[in-house]
């Protein structure tokens, strides 16, 4: 009898673990600047963007790359202007070096060409608002851009921030300039080395939202890259969002022990 109960309890534990694992992750990709007939566009990659000349919507729902299912996640671009020209939707050709971080994430999925540029003065920024998220789940974000302008464009720096998130882990490229766990900079005027802004284990706020903010470099005095241009830096090029799964209250091993102990207590197995 006890053996039968033990077997049943083990099956219950396995079922609970399997149920948690079955919450399969998904990935969604967005090409912020897609030029029809010139660049490739993979099926289920969205093309939301912003800027002068942009023919696509500034907001919409992301699709699961694998099967095209609607993720229910809404992305929207909001520009905070400074002066002069606003962000331009530019179709410059670009690539990333083989084996680079950007290459590993985006190669053969999102065309590296194109960028969303900058305003003609300091203090502009672009918010990528990601909403419709599950507050009880975790996500990964990866973003990058490359004008591929050569050495003369290295001073054109992009500052990336993650905002309004309930926790995250810094996972940006090793050679990127880390300012803090939620802030990083690297050159986007020349980024053939394929640096990326990446955060994992992002917990959305209670409103199911977090924001990725891009702008020009903040300057050396504020902890940014030395010699960064006063206002030139590229706002966006492409990004990937991944659903990791539900937040875990405890690590898996502790969870199994807790479930097993509770079941033993409830049925008084000795």
What residue spans do the PLM features occupy?
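Contiguous ligand/interfacial binding patches
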Residues: 24-46, 146-245
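Surface-exposed, low-complexity/disordered Ser/Thr/Gly/Pro/Asn-rich loops and linkers
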Residues: 65-131
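Short, flexible loop/turn segments at beta-strand junctions in immunoglobulin-like
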Residues: 130-134, 201-203
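Bacterial N-terminal signal peptides
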Residues: 7-16
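Residue-level detector of buried hydrophobic side-chain packing
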Residues: 139-143, 239, 263
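A short beta-strand element within beta-rich, extracytoplasmic domains
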Residues: 135-150
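Boundary/junction segments of secreted and surface-exposed precursor proteins
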Residues: 17-57, 246-261, 265
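Positively charged n-region of N-terminal signal peptides that target proteins for export
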Residues: 1-5
